[in-house]
Amino acid sequence: MTLSVDNLLMAQLENFRLKVFRTVGEHLSFRKAAELLFLTQPAVTLQIKALEQDLGVRLFDRSGGHVTLTKEGAILLRYAHKIAAIVSEVEQELLPGEGQLSGILALGVSTTIAQYVLPRLLGVFLAEHARLQLSLHSGNTDAIVQLLLSDKVSIGLIEGPARQREVRTEAFMEDRLVLIARPDLEFRRLSHDRLLASTLLVREYGSGSRHVVEAALENAGFKLKSFKNVIELDSTEAIKSAVEAGLGVGFVSCWAIHKEIELGALEVVEVEGLRVTRNYLVVSRVGPEPSGAAGAFRSFALDRAKHLSEQYENTRHRNAPSR
């Protein structure tokens, strides 16, 4: 028996109430759900009421002018995400056409990867799978792992370690975190004493970059509390802007400073005995390997990353300043 596209569309229609519920639950807004689903707000309300009647429970509390999930609603939302992922995988398995992917790729990506590496991956991947819809979430490493554990994403790319037993990680690319400074400060090489006398700009707690930098500094005999001053910032772009403004020095991914190095706005500072490296990681739930869109993206990322690393090394050697 073959399953036609029409059959699959009918299956989607039968689950429409659950899709409406999932959209309201993700945004905690009937108005936003109506906009995203191209429905009127009363139509969304009608679908939710019908689902509540079918299940015999209240799914949302709308008192006080705010929409919140009830205990039963939170349970259903968790399973609604799982059901959506399974439906997407079924469609990809049964739709005709070799290599054709459809449905939704729910992808969680930590901040630095999302800004500087992901566009190079997605451009090629989505061109190969034009029927695929992308649902992209970004945040720091801890946030992405939590999205994975709550089934809001089916696969993730993170910058720091994930210690939860429910997830597994695979290294797909090496990254080097470099210390940057404003060129006119003439910091080409820093002694340990001069580094400690500088203001250090770091990412917030929960960031993979923050974890890796702290661990590398400690291995080299440094403690954050030993620095003259430490300023926490919530993004790589904020660190770069602060360094350009002369507020201090900071560690950022080598992927994040191509343009600034070429333009002479920033320079890389060497610190004796200090090299900060990490692996970018593909993260997924423990159990069967990801399949469908998530599995295809995992395989693509693991393969494509090799080419990106080679491109970066070639660019770095071409742009390396003569000393």
How should each PLM-predicted stretch be described?
Residues 17, 54-55, 76-98, 160, ...:
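Alpha-helical linker/hinge and terminal dimerization helices associated
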Residues 117, 269-311, 315-318:
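A late-sequence structural motif
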Residues 102-165:
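Central regulatory/effector-binding core of bacterial HTH transcription factors
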Residues 140-145, 149-153, 158-159, 222-269:
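Hydrophobic hinge/microswitch elements
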Residues 168-205:
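Flexible hinge/capping segments at coil-to-helix
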Residues 200-222, 290-291, 308-316:
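Secondary-structure junction motif
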Residues 22-40:
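Short helix-boundary/capping micro-motifs
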